[in-house]
């Protein structure tokens, strides 16, 4: 069952809360509300029906609370701004309009706590709830401490946690002390501190620390989710009585975190409607003037007799189909059911591997935790024996796992818990790849060069010499982060520990959503420093390692890359010499320039084609290069046995298309692709080559270059679509 929470925020809206103190450019109320809004918007984002929020205003101009005392004696200027209940965007915006400084500062903070206490008592009764009261004040209004001990006892009896956060309150642990503090404020701080100390569950602190900690991402804690409950077997217990069978339970140990997903909404002209929801779905998405967008998909076929030339087709009349070459092969539901791999729920050990032979890069996903079935001593004994055996033999188990009937099987690696000496006996499981998921690539060796003749070279311009290796070793040692950080006692510790590394995409997205919920017209906040502090090497360490960096640059003979300047055609970038001299002009003075016709080879067509266009100085050179590339594509198609060379021809065509778009000469490509289509469909390229057109050119979107892709093109989008039919 989901956790139930009841939290009441007591917010000081007194006249003094409108003032700015200690060099801040925001009022005490705005400063304190940064914490309140963050907490409330987190509750709204969770969309949990069982998380209830109430708000009590302290030092309000009016008095409106639930105390049935004559003229609210002792509870003046205390108002309930929001009754306890689920928090929605509508109630959030309604609450925001009520948070304004008042013109009074005479209400008693302890009386406001009593109002919040009775709100929680009335709402939660004696049910199981997490009860909490959070007080935000600057301590300027008078406080009567005559009944503080009695109030603390009431809080303890109900089981309420009291948190008091004061604006500019002294906090020795945080290291803050307000200078020239008014005497009455100092006395009020002591009263509130004493009240918190008398509570069995409470906290007292300064608002500066609370606001500072808002930037630290809060890791979501979740309840253990049982993914499997059944036998873990070794062998087939139904066939062999000696087979091993242990009743186990499997839970998720780690789960991939994802950023919140967005949905399409609309601002309708009619009255807003509330989306239907149930108890498990959370609060309704309503009250903000937006409605979710519903998608409607229809299927149509051409029919000259129907209105508009098209007729709607029912879903019952449709069948899935797969493309096989240029042929569409339909598959009915019966064929799909026949092709499904039938599985039954099972968890079976299929083998064992030594720990030393397992490579960590084979880990494929989220980790699971396997423990013995609860209240089953036989299962506990059996699993314990298996875990100890794996430890002693330094082995891992490999298991086939199907969490439910007809689910796809997984291969899991079962690792015994390394902390077995702490009486924590469990197995960790990690998904393994199947054979077709593993790609083996051959790379040239890093310590030698193999020549074409078979010679082995240990000294080569592509291999590091001893000086370079030593310089790199010194640089790595100088940039060592293992002891660059500090622990709480100031001793050397690891820099950027894993517990301090947060995903900036996920947490900044959450922070931005919370900010936009409260301030829809304000700009988005910058990325919190805690999310980016480890994205770059620390500057002091870089300065300290400058000598090693300079030595590495010298040993590696690192040279500055010449800047690129705009070429003569205004389309491509050309390299400008560091000297600034015109090399072509200097060479033309010593020897006459002869124009060479560029030649592109079939074996190295793409790099040579790009190189020619990179240095092209006139349209004639570009036309020659495009013509040669086109001839190579036609030759590949013509020489292809079946479709063997089609992928290579399509890749050449794709590069040709992209480069001619960049060179702003789409006409060359459009003329060529028109002729190529005619040749492919007419059989002029050594047989039936229509598959090259339909699968690789039409399917690869390598048709005419349109005006959207190149401003100088004269082909419209409709013409390009018609060309591909």
Swiss-Prot record:
Principal subcellular localisation of the protein: nucleus
Keyword Thylakoid: no
GO molecular function, one term: ATP binding
Alphabetized UniProt keyword annotations: ATP-binding, Chromosome, DNA damage, DNA recombination, DNA repair, DNA-binding, Helicase, Hydrolase, Nucleotide-binding, Nucleus, Telomere
GO CC annotations on file: chromosome, telomeric region; Ku70:Ku80 complex
CDD domains referenced in this protein's UniProt entry, alphabetically: KU80, vWA_ku
Protein localization: Nucleus; Chromosome, Telomere
EC number in record: 3.6.4.12
Recorded catalytic activity of this chain's protein: ATP + H2O = ADP + phosphate + H(+)
Keyword GTP-binding: no
Matching Gene3D superfamilies: 1.10.1600.10, 2.40.290.10, Ku, C-terminal domain (1.25.40.240), von Willebrand factor, type A domain (3.40.50.410)
Record Pfam families: Ku, Ku_N, Ku_PK_bind
Domain Ku: 232-478
GO BP field: DNA recombination; double-strand break repair via nonhomologous end joining; telomere maintenance
Principal EC category: hydrolase
Protein family according to the UniProt entry: Belongs to the ku80 family.
Function recorded in the entry: Single-stranded DNA-dependent ATP-dependent helicase. Involved in non-homologous end joining (NHEJ) DNA double strand break repair. DNA-binding is sequence-independent but has a high affinity to nicks in double-stranded DNA and to the ends of duplex DNA. Binds to naturally occurring chromosomal ends, and therefore provides chromosomal end protection. Required also for telomere recombination to repair telomeric ends in the absence of telomerase. ku70, of the ku70/ku80 heterodimer, binds to the stem loop of tlc1, the RNA component of telomerase. Involved in telomere maintenance.
Subunit (UniProt): Heterodimer of mus-51/ku70 and mus-52/ku80.
Protein name, UniProt field: ATP-dependent DNA helicase II subunit 2
Organism: Neurospora crassa (strain ATCC 24698 / 74-OR23-1A / CBS 708.71 / DSM 1257 / FGSC 987)
Lineage summary: Eukaryota, Fungi, Dikarya, Ascomycota, Pezizomycotina
Gene: mus-52
């Amino acid at each position: 069952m989901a956790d139930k929470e009841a939290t009441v925020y007591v917010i000081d809206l007194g006249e003094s809360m409108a003032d700015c103190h200690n060099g801040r450019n925001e009022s005490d109320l705005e400063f304190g509300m940064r914490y309140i809004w963050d907490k409330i918007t987190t509750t709204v984002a969770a969309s949990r029906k069982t998380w209830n929020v109430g708000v009590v205003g302290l030092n309000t101009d009016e008095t409106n609370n639930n105390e049935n005392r004559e003229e609210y004696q002792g509870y003046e200027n205390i108002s309930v701004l929001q009754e306890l209940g689920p928090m929605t965007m509508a109630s959030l915006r309604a609450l925001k309009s009520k948070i304004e400084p008042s013109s009074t500062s005479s209400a008693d903070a302890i009386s406001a706590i009593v109002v919040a206490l009775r709100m929680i008592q009335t709402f939660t009764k004696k049910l199981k709830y997490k009860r909490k009261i959070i007080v935000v004040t600057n301590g300027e209004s008078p406080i009567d401490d005559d009944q503080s001990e009695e109030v603390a006892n009431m809080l303890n009896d109900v089981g309420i946690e009291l948190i008091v956060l004061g604006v500019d309150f002294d906090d020795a642990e945080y290291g803050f002390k307000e200078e020239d503090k008014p005497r009455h404020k100092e006395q009020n701080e002591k009263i509130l501190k004493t009240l918190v100390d008398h509570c069995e569950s409470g906290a007292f602190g300064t608002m500066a620390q609370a606001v500072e900690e808002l930037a630290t991402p809060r890791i979501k804690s979740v309840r253990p989710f049982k993914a499997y409950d059944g036998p873990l077997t070794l062998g087939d217990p139904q066939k062999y009585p000696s087979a091993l069978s242990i009743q186990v339970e499997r839970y998720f140990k780690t789960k991939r975190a994802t950023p919140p997903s967005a949905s399409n909404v609309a601002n309708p002209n009619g009255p807003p409607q509330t989306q239907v929801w149930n108890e498990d779905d959370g609060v309704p998405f309503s009250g903000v003037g937006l409605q979710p967008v519903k998608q409607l998909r229809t299927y149509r076929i051409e029919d000259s007799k129907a209105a508009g030339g098209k007729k709607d087709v029912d879903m019952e009349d449709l069948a899935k189909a797969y493309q096989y070459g240029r042929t569409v092969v339909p598959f009915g539901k019966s064929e799909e059911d026949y092709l499904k791999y039938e599985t039954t729920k099972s968890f079976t050990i299929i083998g064992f591997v030594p720990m030393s032979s397992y490579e960590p890069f084979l880990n494929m996903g989220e980790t699971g935790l396997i423990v013995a079935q609860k209240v089953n001593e036989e299962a506990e004994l059996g699993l314990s024996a298996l875990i100890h055996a794996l430890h002693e033999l330094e082995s891992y188990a490999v298991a086939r796992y199907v969490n439910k009937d007809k689910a796809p099987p997984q291969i899991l690696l079962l690792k015994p818990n390394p902390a077995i000496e702490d009486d924590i006996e469990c197995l960790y499981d990690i998904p393994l790849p199947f054979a077709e998921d593993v790609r083996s690539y051959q790379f040239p060796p890093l310590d030698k060069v193999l020549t074409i003749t078979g010679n082995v070279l240990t000294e080569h311009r592509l291999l590091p010499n001893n000086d370079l290796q030593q310089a790199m070793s010194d640089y790595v040692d100088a940039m060592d982060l293992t002891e660059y950080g500090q622990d709480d006692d100031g001793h050397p510790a690891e820099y950027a520990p894993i517990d301090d590394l947060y995903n900036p995409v996920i947490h900044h997205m959450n922070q931005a959503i919370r900010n936009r919920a409260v301030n829809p017209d304000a700009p988005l906040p910058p990325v919190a420093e805690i999310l980016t502090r480890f994205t770059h090497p620390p500057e002091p360490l870089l300065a300290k390692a400058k000598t090693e960096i300079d030595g590495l640059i010298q040993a590696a003979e690192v040279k500055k890359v010449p800047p690129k300047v705009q070429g003569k055609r205004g389309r491509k970038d050309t390299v400008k010499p560091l000297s600034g001299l015109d090399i072509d002009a200097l060479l033309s003075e010593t020897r006459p320039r002869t124009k060479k016709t560029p030649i592109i080879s079939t074996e190295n067509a793409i790099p040579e084609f790009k190189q020619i266009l990179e240095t092209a100085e006139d349209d004639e050179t570009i036309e020659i290069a495009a013509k040669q590339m086109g001839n190579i594509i036609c030759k590949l198609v013509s020489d292809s046995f079946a479709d063997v060379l089609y992928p290579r021809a399509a890749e050449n065509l794709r590069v040709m298309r992209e480069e001619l778009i960049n060179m702003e000469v789409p006409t060359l490509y459009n003329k060529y692709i028109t002729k190529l289509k005619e040749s492919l469909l007419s059989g002029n390229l050594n047989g039936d080559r229509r598959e090259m057109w339909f699968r690789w050119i039409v399917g690869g979107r390598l048709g005419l270059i349109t005006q959207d892709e190149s401003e100088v093109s004269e082909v419209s989008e409709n013409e390009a679509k018609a060309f591909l039919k």
